[in-house]
Amino acid sequence: MSSISIIRLQDRPELKDSLARWFHEKWGVPLEAYQESMEDCLTARSAVPQWIAALEEDRIVGRLGVIENDFHNRKDLTPNVCAVYVEEDKRCQGIAGEMLRFICRDMYARGVGTLYLLTDHTSFYERYGWTYFCMVQGDGEDSLSRMYRHVETEFPEKAVPPILK
């Protein structure tokens, strides 16, 4: 079994187009929106947006992003972790948890200690230090969704990409 590494898009900019296409196909958000956000990640000096991926050799097996707002009415709850996804054949191996830990530490190193996440899952994110914060109205949604918050309280020596074995 090969190991899984967590990488920043900034460290592997050649993955931009394949990541943008994948996110577009998975979530239905226009391809151009992902391309623009990822280009901003690569060229802007601000902490947001950010995009990471979990790689098994050259195969992308997990991904997530950090954006200002994940399509909800609480514009004050920012930035948001979005589009957390691990390929089905790689689930239950700790990859999502490692990606979440990595992005929380990486954002803390960039000066952002508090992150928000919109989800309908009721117990998954608590395992990784996220706490339920409030209910929010998703854009175009009839029902409310759960907003979680994560506050990074410790700064590790280095926010280095973890390797899973």
Where are these regions (language model features)?
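Conserved acetyl-CoA pyrophosphate-binding loop and the N-cap/start of the following alpha-helix
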Residues: K90, G94-F102, V112
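Active-site rim helix/loop that mediates acceptor-substrate recognition in acyltransferases
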Residues: H24, G28-E56, V61
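Conserved active-site alpha-helix within GNAT-family acetyltransferase domains
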Residues: A109, G113, T119-S143
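Conserved N-terminal entry element of GNAT/NAT acetyltransferase domains
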Residues: M1-D17, V151-K165
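Short coil/turn motifs at secondary-structure junctions
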Residues: N69-F71, D89, T122
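Short coil/loop residues immediately preceding or within conserved phosphate-binding loops
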Residues: P49, D76, V81, D142
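Conserved beta-strand in the GNAT
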Residues: A53, R59-N69, N80, Y85
